[in-house]
């Protein structure tokens, strides 16, 4: 028997869990609440889910000493029968209840599964990893919208969010397992702590080349200069982290010497935004986020994107042009990986934000310094070495998949558009 005060309720005789299920209809919760109100029970917990018009609701109540569990069961069942609903009842032992109360201080994490479409093998793979790591799933929510049966293979993207309780046996092994299964199943799986900052982040910093746009600008300029293959090979090695970024950038830049500056506009005209970029940034702006481009590319292209997308800040390299000709140099310091991290810190300070309130998104090894210090660092369609080092990665859906990592549903975001 549970005795004494419990959350301000009367002396308690028993704790009762009531489970109501059946076809959803208006008035079910009210009908059950009306019965319970006559017995002066205290509501300790309540929750419900509706899947394809099937309701499953749970109410945990403390029954006072003068109350009767059998009478409550009888009257609740009677009202449910009139609604063509069913009910189950469980008297919760004192020890079990106290254990439940004690769980409230335990760590909680969010596991987000993203894919073009989600099948049972994806759920099996993800939930096996969480179970093996001793994590208990408290809640599962579909964040993506409803889809028709026809054409599910061609739909945009799907997302399911798991709220899990506890700490993994090995955080490193968990992340490694999730990264491995993501590659095997062509899905993305994010794992992050469920903190107050998750939906209160306010600054998003993007890399530009191969992140917001689908190309490396310096490679495109090199094609115009007739040194495309040579520059592309250096770019690939730099993005994989095999060559120091500043060294590789200087080498590639020198090969552009003599290029007519009019070519910059030609290249800009053929650049394309990566999937989901415009939708993501519009949504972020509507939600009040500050956005910035911090790029090892060039200001000419960054400022063009700023105009198209409405980005708040742009930091990139200033290509030196003399008499309409590219000199093969930049003016000022080169924005390398460390400078990216420094600029992220400066932006956060200007906005009065902690680093926990900052999101960083990039694809290359030179993005890792800023990705690693941001509260939410995301490798987008990145090289394997970058994905392995970043806490989160997205490779199989568009940039707008980031909204799911922030906890927003399609229903939430569609209201903004």
What does each model-identified segment do?
Residues 196-246:
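Active-site neighborhood of HAD-like aspartate-dependent phosphohydrolases
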Residues 95-104, 191-202, 235-264, 325, ...:
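Long, charged amphipathic helices and adjacent flexible linkers at domain junctions
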Residues 30, 34, 44, 74, ...:
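Solvent-exposed alpha-helical segments within well-ordered globular domains of core cellular machineries
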Residues 23, 27, 54, 67, ...:
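Conserved active-site and cofactor/substrate-binding residues in soluble primary-metabolism enzymes
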Residues 2, 6-201:
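A conserved regulatory-domain signal marking ACT and ACT-like small-molecule sensing domains
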């Amino acid at each position: 028997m549970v005795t004494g005060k419990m959350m301000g309720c009367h002396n308690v005789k028993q704790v009762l869990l009531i489970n109501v299920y059946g076809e959803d209809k208006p008035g079910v919760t009210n009908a059950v609440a009306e019965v319970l109100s006559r017995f002066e029970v205290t509501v300790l917990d309540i929750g419900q889910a509706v899947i394809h018009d099937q309701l499953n609701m749970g109410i945990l109540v403390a029954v006072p000493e003068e109350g009767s569990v059998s009478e409550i069961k009888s009257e609740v069942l009677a009202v449910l029968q009139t609604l063509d609903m069913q009910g189950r009842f469980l008297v919760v032992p004192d020890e079990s209840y106290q254990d439940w109360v004690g769980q409230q201080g335990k760590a909680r994490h969010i596991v987000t599964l993203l894919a073009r479409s989600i099948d049972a093998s994806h759920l099996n793979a993800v939930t096996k990893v969480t179970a093996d790591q001793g994590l208990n799933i408290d809640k599962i929510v579909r964040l993506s919208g409803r889809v028709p049966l026809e054409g599910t293979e061609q739909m945009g993207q799907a997302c399911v969010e798991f709220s899990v309780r506890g700490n993994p046996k090995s955080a490193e092994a968990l992340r490694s397992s999730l990264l491995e299964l993501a590659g095997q199943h062509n899905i993305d799986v994010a794992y992050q702590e469920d903190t107050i900052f998750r939906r209160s982040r306010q600054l998003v910093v993007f890399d530009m080349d191969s992140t917001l746009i689908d190309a490396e600008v310096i490679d495109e300029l090199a094609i115009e200069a007739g040194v495309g293959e040579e520059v592309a090979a250096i770019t690939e090695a730099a993005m994989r982290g095999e060559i120091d970024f500043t060294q590789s950038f200087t080498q590639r830049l020198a090969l552009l010497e003599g290029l007519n500056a009019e070519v910059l506009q030609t290249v800009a005209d053929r650049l394309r935004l990566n999937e989901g970029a415009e939708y993501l940034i519009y949504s972020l702006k509507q939600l009040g986020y500050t956005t910035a481009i911090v790029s090892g590319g060039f200001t000419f292209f960054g400022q063009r994107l700023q105009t198209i997308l409405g980005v708040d800040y742009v930091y990139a390299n200033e290509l030196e042009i003399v008499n309409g000709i590219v000199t093969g140099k930049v003016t000022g310091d080169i924005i390398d990986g460390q400078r990216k991290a420094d600029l992220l810190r400066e932006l956060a300070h200007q906005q009065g934000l902690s680093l926990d309130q900052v999101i960083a998104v990039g694809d290359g090894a030179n993005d890792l310094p800023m990705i690693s210090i941001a509260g939410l660092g995301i490798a987008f369609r990145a090289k394997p070495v970058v994905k392995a080092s970043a806490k989160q990665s997205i490779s199989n859906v568009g940039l707008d998949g980031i909204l799911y990592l922030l906890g927003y549903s399609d229903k939430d975001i569609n209201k903004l558009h």
